[in-house]
Curated annotation (Swiss-Prot):
Keywords: Antioxidant, Cytoplasm, Disulfide bond, Oxidoreductase, Peroxidase, Redox-active center. It comes from Methanococcus maripaludis (strain DSM 14266 / JCM 13030 / NBRC 101832 / S2 / LL). It is found in: Cytoplasm. The lineage of its organism: Archaea, Methanobacteriati, Methanobacteriota, Methanomada group, Methanococci. It is an enzyme of class 1 (oxidoreductase). Its EC number is 1.11.1.24. Signal peptide: none annotated. One of its GO terms (cellular component) is cytosol. Thiol-specific peroxidase that catalyzes the reduction of hydrogen peroxide and organic hydroperoxides to water and alcohols, respectively. Plays a role in cell protection against oxidative stress by detoxifying peroxides. This is Peroxiredoxin. Substrate binds at R122. PANTHER family: ALKYL HYDROPEROXIDE REDUCTASE C (PTHR10681:SF121), THIOREDOXIN PEROXIDASE (PTHR10681). Residues 2-159 form the Thioredoxin domain.
Length: 217
C-alpha cells in the first residue's frame, strides 16, 4: 500500500484508450493526473460520478491535470458503459478507464476493503508531474464524491508548490477568504522579519506565526 509522498508505482495498464504506462505517460507530457476508482460499471452512483467528472474535465485540464478511472472490470464492460452514458445521458466520457480485471493495481493501491467485498471503494489519488503521490482520499462505496472538492484539492496542492498553505474551505475561508497562508517562521531572525513584513504592509497577519497574503500568480 502506498502513501502520500511516495512515487506512484510503475505499471502498465489496459484502458479504454489502449495500453498506458503509469506514471510514465503523464510524466513525459508534464502533467498531473487524478486516478479514481469506482466499484463497478453500470451502477447508479458510479454513473453520476463519471458524468460529474466529465463535466469538470475542462477545469482539470486548465490545471494541467488529466483524469483516469479504474475498476475491477474488463475493458469491454467499460466500453459498453461509456456507450450507454453517451446514448442515455448525452455525455461523452473523454478520459480513459483502466480495466484492472484481476484487481492487481487496486490491491497495490489499497483500494479494496476486506469489509466491502471484492470491488474497490471510491479512492482518489492525486499525482503530480514528477509521479509523486500528493493526496489520497477514500470514500465508502455508498457515498458519491464531491468533484468540486477534488478540483479544489488540485488547485490547493499546486498553490502549495508556490510556497503557500491554504486555509480551511479555501478559497472561501470564513475570515481570510481567498488569501493564502505564509508558512510560519522557523527561527528568531525569520520571526523578526515576518513581524516587520506585517508592520510594513508587505504581509497581513495576526502574529508572527499567522501571516497571510494574496496569492501571487
Amino acid at each position: 500500500m502506498v502513501v502520500i509522498g511516495e512515487k506512484f508505482p510503475e505499471v502498465e495498464v489496459t484502458t479504454t484508450h489502449g495500453k498506458l504506462k503509469l506514471p510514465e505517460h503523464y510524466i513525459e507530457s508534464g502533467k498531473w493526473f487524478v486516478l479514481f476508482s469506482h466499484p463497478g460499471d453500470f451502477t447508479p452512483v458510479c454513473t453520476t460520478e463519471f458524468v460529474a467528472f466529465q463535466k469538470r474535465y475542462d477545469q482539470f485540464r486548465e490545471l494541467n491535470t488529466e483524469l483516469i478511472g479504474l475498476s475491477i472490470d474488463q475493458v469491454f464492460s467499460h466500453i459498453k458503459w461509456v456507450e450507454w452514458i453517451k446514448e442515455k445521458l448525452d455525455v461523452d466520457i473523454e478520459f480513459p478507464i483502466i480495466a484492472d480485471d484481476r484487481g492487481e493495481l487496486a490491491v497495490k493501491l489499497g483500494m479494496i476493503s476486506p469489509y466491502k467485498g471484492n470491488n474497490t471503494v471510491r479512492a482518489v489519488f492525486v499525482v503530480d508531474a514528477t509521479g509523486t503521490i500528493r493526496a489520497i482520499i477514500y470514500y465508502p462505496q455508498e457515498v458519491g464524491r464531491n468533484m468540486d472538492e477534488i478540483v479544489r484539492l488540485v488547485k490547493a496542492l499546486q498553490t502549495a508548490d508556490k510556497g503557500y498553505a491554504t486555509p480551511a474551505n479555501w478559497p472561501n475561508n470564513d475570515f481570510l477568504n481567498e488569501k493564502v497562508i505564509v508558512p510560519p517562521a522557523n527561527n528568531m531572525d525569520a520571526r523578526k522579519k515576518r513581524l516587520e513584513a506585517c508592520k510594513s504592509g508587505e504581509l497581513e497577519g495576526y502574529d508572527w506565526w499567522f501571516c497571510y497574503t494574496d496569492l501571487k500568480e
